């Protein structure tokens, strides 16, 4: 497995080691992130840490200036480091982020099968959606594809299989020419050690307090154009609900600061909360809303469900596929403040229903969405394609 960063792999890679299917893990993280932190023997991990420090140094000194060409250089640097420690395997599983072409070429040279994992929709679809959104917000000119995104598109077409966290992502790549029959969808999981339901006593207390405490809507996401915060703000402005509050947790991008200024006083903002500390914010809220324009999955939806919240999110968010509308959440169209307002008001007027939907979300998360379950499905996929590949070679 190779990933130029950490992303979600640290949540389940220990299960691959336990099952005996992991040969080596190439990644890029700070020096403090060692094999023992991942549940792996040091002999199986290769950390291209210099890339990670170079990226952070560039961001500190230059910000966004020359980001694309320098990151492309850093990515190639990481790949060459990985190749110096290469070990042939039956399957290369790698995250598609425009930084794998050398590794994919080497894997094919070795006769290995290659699984590429895109975490967002195809770059062309993503560009179209974001260009429309930038124009709508009036915050910047049209975005053009950069070399890293073009590399991602090219890499996808050289993979034997794609692994997607949602059907939304799978359909996007299929529209752009990748064989639909070679795309496997496995929804991502949630760490149930950190994100857990309320205790029975807490739940009873929350039920008793329904009529006396404020109704809280929470959104946890970076505040960037892609996440669609303005549609939630417009919905909130329409509703004017008494004894209610809107909480945003997430860093604000420079491009969104002037946009948010138009809604000053309408919401409470916390710039950063460590992931393992989010539970208390979820558990003291009533509804989770994520109005994304595009989101390949959105782990925060699964986290909120595991903590007992009904979820309102858009059809362009992969995690929407987890929802049973009316039972544990609602799906709404993108860019529809009216639809968001309608669902929020429904739960505001029926707070007992919101509590019951949150309980249903809890049960689903606990039964179906642990990372151990994800790893089981992934290992089954590895074995399936290896068996198919072996038969093809024999014939």
Question: How should each PLM-predicted stretch be described?
Answer:
Residues 310-313:
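Short hydrophobic beta-strand element within catalytic cores of glycosyltransferases
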Residues 208-227, 233-237:
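Conserved donor-binding/catalytic core segment of Leloir-type glycosyltransferases
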Residues 168, 189:
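Carbohydrate-associated surface elements
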Residues 293:
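Aromatic "clamp/platform" in nucleotide-sugar-dependent glycosyltransferases that forms part
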Residues 346, 353-368, 374-377:
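A short, well-ordered alpha-helix in the C-terminal region of glycosyltransferases
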Residues 256-279:
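Nucleotide-activated donor-binding/catalytic signature segment of Leloir-type glycosyltransferases, i.e.
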Residues 325-326, 330-337, 346-351:
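Conserved acidic donor-binding segment of nucleotide-sugar-dependent glycosyltransferases
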Residues 56-69, 110-150, 193:
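Acceptor-binding helix/loop patch of EC 2.4 sugar-transfer enzymes
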């Amino acid at each position: 497995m190779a990933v130029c960063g950490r992303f979600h792999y640290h949540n389940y890679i220990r299960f691959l080691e336990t099952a005996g299917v992991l040969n080596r893990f190439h990644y890029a993280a700070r020096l403090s992130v060692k094999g023992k932190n991942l549940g792996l023997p040091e002999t199986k991990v290769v950390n291209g840490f210099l890339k990670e420090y170079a990226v952070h140094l560039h961001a500190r000194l230059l910000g966004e200036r020359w980001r694309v060409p320098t990151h492309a250089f850093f990515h190639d640097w990481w790949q060459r480091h990985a190749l110096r420690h290469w070990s042939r395997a039956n399957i290369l599983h790698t995250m598609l982020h425009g930084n794998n072409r050398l590794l994919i070429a080497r894997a094919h040279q070795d006769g290995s099968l290659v699984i590429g994992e895109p975490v967002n929709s195809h770059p062309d679809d993503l560009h179209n959606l974001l260009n429309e959104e930038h124009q709508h917000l009036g915050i910047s000119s049209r975005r053009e594809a950069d070399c890293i995104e073009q590399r991602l598109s090219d890499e996808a077409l050289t993979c034997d299989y794609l692994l997607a966290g949602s059907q939304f992502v799978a359909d996007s790549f299929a529209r752009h020419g990748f064989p639909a029959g070679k795309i496997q969808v496995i929804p991502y999981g949630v760490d149930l050690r950190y994100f857990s339901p309320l205790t029975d006593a807490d739940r009873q207390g929350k039920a008793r307090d329904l009529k006396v405490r404020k109704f809280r809507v929470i959104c946890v996401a970076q505040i960037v154009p892609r996440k669609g915060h303005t549609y939630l703000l417009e919905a909130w402005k329409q509703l004017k609900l008494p004894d209610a509050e809107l909480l945003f947790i997430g860093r604000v991008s420079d491009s969104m600061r002037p946009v948010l200024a138009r809604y000053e006083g309408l919401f409470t903002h916390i710039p950063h909360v460590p992931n393992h500390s989010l539970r208390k914010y979820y558990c003291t809220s009533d509804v989770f809303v994520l109005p994304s324009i595009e989101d390949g999955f959105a782990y925060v939806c699964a986290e909120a469900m595991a903590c007992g919240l009904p979820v309102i999110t858009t059809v362009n968010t992969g995690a929407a596929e987890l929802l049973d509308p009316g039972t544990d959440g609602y799906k709404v169209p993108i860019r529809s403040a009216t639809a968001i307002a309608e669902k929020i008001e429904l739960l505001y007027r029926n707070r007992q229903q919101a509590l019951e939907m949150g309980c249903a979300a809890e049960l689903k998360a606990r039964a179906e969405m642990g990372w151990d379950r994800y790893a089981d499905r992934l290992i089954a996929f590895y074995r399936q394609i290896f068996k198919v590949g072996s038969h093809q070679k024999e014939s």
